[in-house]
Amino acid sequence: MARSVWKGPFVDGYLLKKAEKVRESGRSEVIKMWTRRSTILPQFVGLTFGVYNGSKHIPVSVNEDMVGHKFGEFAPTRTYYGHGADKKAKRK
């Protein structure tokens, strides 16, 4: 079920402060963050965030198409190694 429109998008407060500091400084640094649940806002476009996936920070460069999505959507937490090979085919 989606979030109510009257509540607005959820973003952790400290993330807004960090993004504002980087914008003011003009430096292009990766903003480390642990909040995968935060929504990407239009003011984040052009910034790079290091989204934590449980073991390391994955760099995510925000563009216009990402606005409205959650940060966690762009940093997968599980590694897919593919399905196991068919054991019957190996023996032949």
From Swiss-Prot:
One of its GO terms (molecular function) is rRNA binding. It comes from the Bacteria. Coiled coil: none annotated. GO terms for cellular component: cytoplasm; small ribosomal subunit. SUPFAM superfamilies: Ribosomal protein S19. Gene3D superfamilies: 30s Ribosomal Protein S19, Chain A (3.30.860.10). Keywords: Ribonucleoprotein, Ribosomal protein, RNA-binding, rRNA-binding. GO terms for biological process: ribosomal small subunit assembly; translation. PROSITE patterns: RIBOSOMAL_S19. Transmembrane segments: none annotated. Pfam families: Ribosomal_S19. Belongs to the universal ribosomal protein uS19 family. Protein S19 forms a complex with S13 that binds strongly to the 16S ribosomal RNA. This is Small ribosomal subunit protein uS19. It comes from Allorhizobium ampelinum (strain ATCC BAA-846 / DSM 112012 / S4) (Agrobacterium vitis (strain S4)). The gene is rpsS.
